A protein has these predicted regions:
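Structural recognition of the beta-strand scaffold that forms the well-ordered cores
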Residues: 72-74, 102-105
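Conserved alpha/beta-hydrolase "acid-adjacent" motif
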Residues: 80-89, 114
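Accessory cap/linker subdomain of secreted extracellular hydrolases
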Residues: 1-65
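Short helix-capping segments at alpha-helix termini
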Residues: 94-100
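Acidic beta-to-alpha connecting loop that harbors the catalytic carboxylate
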Residues: 77-80, 107-110
């Protein structure tokens, strides 16, 4: 089911990103949902622009194809910023022909690989990002084991 107003939100997002990529001032419309506004403000904040610009211009798949060293890509299934199915499946497919690339998809890891007890469907941007720097959440056990096993295999 389409989200009411979703097409207008996407058009405003696309326009803001086009301005950002072209190094023009970015106008973040006040009527966008808070999550989209915060994303755009964060990306286009002058202090973040060098990193954001480089990140935006990077083609991850091309970069992974060029890397010869061992690579571990860990995407938590409760990450609401990176889709483990959409993005992860592309990387997993590439890993089939690039033996230096390894992937792991821990069931309960969020974007920063911390344990997330809520179901994926219950997560929203504000709730998820507030837990990234919280003291209580711990590194997800499955994510940690994937990292340790990958490192151990390279001793």
């Amino acid at each position: 089911t389409p989200i009411p107003g979703g097409e207008a939100w996407l058009a405003a997002y696309d326009a803001a990103i086009a301005d950002f990529v072209a190094n023009r001032p970015v106008n973040v419309p006040a009527d966008l949902p808070e999550g989209i506004r915060m994303l755009l403000i964060g990306l286009t904040n002058p202090v973040n622009q060098p990193f954001s610009g480089e990140l935006w211009a990077t083609d991850l798949m091309q970069t992974l194809r060029r890397i010869q060293q061992p690579v571990l890509v860990v995407i938590g299934k409760k990450d609401i910023q990176v889709d483990w199915q959409a993005d992860g499946s592309l990387i997993a497919e590439l890993a089939k022909t690039h033996p230096n690339i390894h992937v792991a998809f821990p069931e309960n890891a969020n974007h920063v690989l911390k344990y997330e007890p809520l179901e994926r469907a219950q997560l929203n941007a504000a709730q998820a990002s507030s837990s990234y720097n919280a003291k209580a959440p711990r590194l997800d056990d499955e994510a940690l084991q994937a990292i340790l096993a990958w490192l151990d295999a390279r001793r």
